[in-house]
Amino acid sequence: MPSVMEKPSAGSGILSRSRAKTVPNGGQPHSEDDSSEEEHSHDSMIRVGTNYQAVIPECKPESPARYSNKELKGMLVWSPNHCVSDAKLDKYIAMAKEKHGYNIEQALGMLLWHKHDVEKSLADLANFTPFPDEWTVEDKVLFEQAFGFHGKCFQRIQQMLPDKLIPSLVKYYYSWKKTRSRTSVMDRQARRLGGRKDKEDSDELEEGRGGVSEGEPDPADPKREPLPSRPLNARPGPGKKEVQVSQYRHHPLRTRRRPPKGMYLSPEGLTAVSGSPDLANLTLRGLDSQLISLKRQVQSMKQTNSSLRQALEGGIDPLRPPEANTKFNSRWTTDEQLLAVQAIRRYGKDFGAIAEVIGNKTLTQVKTFFVSYRRRFNLEEVLQEWEAEQDGAPGAPVPMEEARRGAPLPAPALEEDDEVQITSVSTSVPRSVPPAPPPPPPPTSLSQPPPLLRPPLPTAPTLLRQPPPLQQGRFLQPRLAPNQPPPPLIRPALAAPRHSARPGPQPPPTLIGTPLEPPAPSL
C-alpha cells in the first residue's frame, strides 16, 4: 500500500485547464502558478501509515498518576459540622472580617484547618496575613493589557499576574466585561469623526487614483517604472494572491486625527502644559473642580425641580377657600334683614344677586321679604334712591306706565289712601246742610297731597256704596256704578307737581257734580 495517495478533486481540473490555456499564450507558465499548484496538491493529500498515527497510552483508571499532571488542584475550604452552631459561626466570621481583615472563604478555611475549633482558629488568625482579593489600579491595567494580548487564555494572563488565581481572574473578567459597553460621549464622538475622516480620505484617494492609469507611469516621477501588464485572456488560478502594497499607504490625511467636538488644542496651552510637570496636574485639578461644581449645580437644580413638581402634583385644592355647606333657612335674623336692605340699595330688584349676597336664602324667600318688609324698612324709598343713581337724576318719579303695570306706589300715598277709606266709612255728612266752602288749606309740603272734601253718603244701600273719592292727580280712578252719577269732587287749588299728571297752572277749587238731594230719614 503506498504511503501517499493523491485525492482527485475539482481543483486539479481547474488547474489543468488554466495551465493549458496559459501555455500557448505565454510559452511557459509562470512560476507562481506552479507553486500554487504544488501547495494545493500538498494540501489535498491523505496521509496513511504508522508515521502519521497518534500514540494512545493504555487506560489506567485507578492509577494515582492520572491527576499528577494537573497544575491546579482543588482544595477543600469548608465543610459544615454540627458541633458549631450558626450563631457561633456568624460571630466568628464577623470577628475575622472586622478585626483581622479575612473574607468569609479565608475565615472558614482557617476554621476547617483547626478541625472546627473556634478558639484555636481565633488565636491563629493573627499569625497569618490574609491574601488580598482586592484589585488595585495596576492590577486592572495589567489585566486589560494581558487580555488584549492573549484574549480569554487565563493561563497566560496569570503569568502576567502571578499573585492572582485563575478563579479570581475569571470572576474579575465577568465583572469587567459589563463595563466595557459603557462608552463616554467623547469616545463616541471620536469614533464618528474618525469614520467621517476615513471616508473623506478614501474619496480623496479614489480621486487621486483616477488621474493616473494603472499601467502608465506617473509623469511627475520619471524614475518610476511602469507596472507589468497582464494579458487580457489570462485568468488567475486558485493560488495565493500577492498582496500589493499601495503607494498611498502612508497618507498624511489618514494618520491625522482631530480631538472630539468641543475640545481645542492651542500652541499656548501645549507649551504651558509641557513647560513644567506640575502644571499639567494643576490644570487637570482645576478642570476637575469645575466639573464637580457643575455637577453640584445640576444636582441642586434637579432637587429644585423635583420639589416644584411635587408642589404642583398637590394641586390648588389646599389654597381654595372652604365651601360652606349652608342650608336654606326661611327665618330672617336681624343681621340678614339689614344685609338684605343694603343689598336692595345696591342691586335694586335683582333678587337673584340679593340671594347670592345673603347666602342662605332662595329667590322666592327674598321676594317674600321684599313684599312683607316693604313698609317696615321703607324699601320704596330705597328703590327710588337706587333708580335715581341708575338714571343719574335724584328723586326721579315713577313713570305712569310702570304704575299702570302694577308698580308699587310710595309709602305716604298708600297711607293717605288708607286714611281716606277709614274716614269715609266712619263719618257721614247730612244731605240737608249745604256744603260749606272749604277752609283755606294749610301750608303743605311737596311730599303730602292737599286735603280732600268728605262727600255725603249716597242713598243707596251700604253694600252698593261707592269707593271714597280721590284727587284728580291720583293714578287709581274710581269705579262708577251703571245707574248712579259720580260723587261730587273738589278740584285742588295747589297740587304738587310730583303728583300731577299734566303740568301747567290750575284754577281755584270748585265743586263738580249735581245738587244734593234731601237726606233720607235716618234709622
Curated annotation (Swiss-Prot):
Its BP terms in the Gene Ontology are: negative regulation of DNA-templated transcription; regulation of transcription by RNA polymerase II
* UniProt keyword annotation of 4Fe-4S present: no
- Annotated SANT domain ranges read 130-181, 327-378
Q: Which residues carry this modification: Asymmetric dimethylarginine?
A: R479
Q: Which compartments does it reside in?
A: Nucleus
Region: Disordered; residue ranges are: 1-43, 185-264, 387-523
Q: Which residues cross the membrane?
A: none
Annotated coiled-coil segments of the chain: 283-314
Where in the numbering of this chain does the ELM2 domain appear?
A: 44-129
Q: Which Gene3D superfamilies match?
A: 1.20.58.1880, 4.10.1240.50, Homeodomain-like
Pro residues bias: start-end ranges = 432-459, 504-523
Q: Which GO terms describe its molecular function?
A: enzyme binding; transcription corepressor activity
Q: What are its GO cellular component terms?
A: histone deacetylase complex; transcription regulator complex
Q: Where is the composition biased (Basic and acidic residues)?
A: 30-43
Instruction: Name the InterPro entries for this protein.
Output: ELM2_dom (IPR000949), Homeodomain-like_sf (IPR009057), REST_helical (IPR049048), SANT/Myb (IPR001005), SANT_dom (IPR017884), Trans_reg/Corepressor (IPR051066)
Q: Which family does it belong to?
A: Belongs to the CoREST family.
- Role this protein plays: May act as a component of a corepressor complex that represses transcription.
Task: Please report the name of this protein according to its UniProt entry.
Answer: REST corepressor 2
User: What phylogenetic lineage does the species belong to?
Assistant: Eukaryota, Metazoa, Chordata, Craniata, Vertebrata
